[in-house]
Amino acid sequence: MEDNQRSRFRKICVFCGSHSGHREVFSDAAIELGNELVKRKIDLVYGGGSVGLMGLISRRVYEGGLHVLGIIPKALMPIEISGETVGDVRVVADMHERKAAMAQEAEAFIALPGGYGTMEELLEMITWSQLGIHKKTVGLLNVDGYYNNLLALFDTGVEEGFIKPGARNIVVSAPTAKELMEKMEEYTPSHMHVASHESWKVEELGDYPGQENKPQ
């Protein structure tokens, strides 16, 4: 994508850890992704907090002059928020409301390395795409092979007949932020939805790129 060409995405939700991991490569990847969002003029939606990978990417995007929205359950604020918080913070009641709000605000999703919470958020967005609840791109930044085993598990699911081959393609993965964003910019869904997009309460989940061109 040329420097003067605007991304198809206006806001992307990034799932990532409230820890930085043991190796610097993970912190570098969070900053690299932040740089890509700034370069493409994409606002950030994330899980709130100013520590770990969450803090690194939120500060980078904010310092780049773009909008940052952190969505965090009230119960997690004392744990995840420490030091200076940048951008806007929206406090919600629980984890379910958090994910719904993130999905409503963003036009696509990216998961950086993280723990159970990051993986759960990623898998829920994949599932929602499979079900037809949203038509938003789901990206996985596979830093230094962190998610190799998870991707292999998806392949096993296809081989054993639990995941349809088309649904395996819901996840767009790449080892670097630049490559991932390039693939996400070009991504077109190829899987069949379990139910129609219109049959869900999609107004609660916001717009997706291209929705404005859909015939009425």
Curated annotation (Swiss-Prot):
EC number: 3.2.2.n1
EC class name: hydrolase
One GO term describing the cellular component: cytosol
Nucleus found in the keyword field: yes
Binding residues for substrate: E80, R98, K99, G115, Y116, G117, T118, M119, E120, E121, T127
Record key words, sorted: Cytokinin biosynthesis, Cytoplasm, Hydrolase, Nucleus
Function of the protein: Cytokinin-activating enzyme working in the direct activation pathway. Phosphoribohydrolase that converts inactive cytokinin nucleotides to the biologically active free-base forms.
Assigned protein family: Belongs to the LOG family.
Protein name (database record): Cytokinin riboside 5'-monophosphate phosphoribohydrolase LOG8
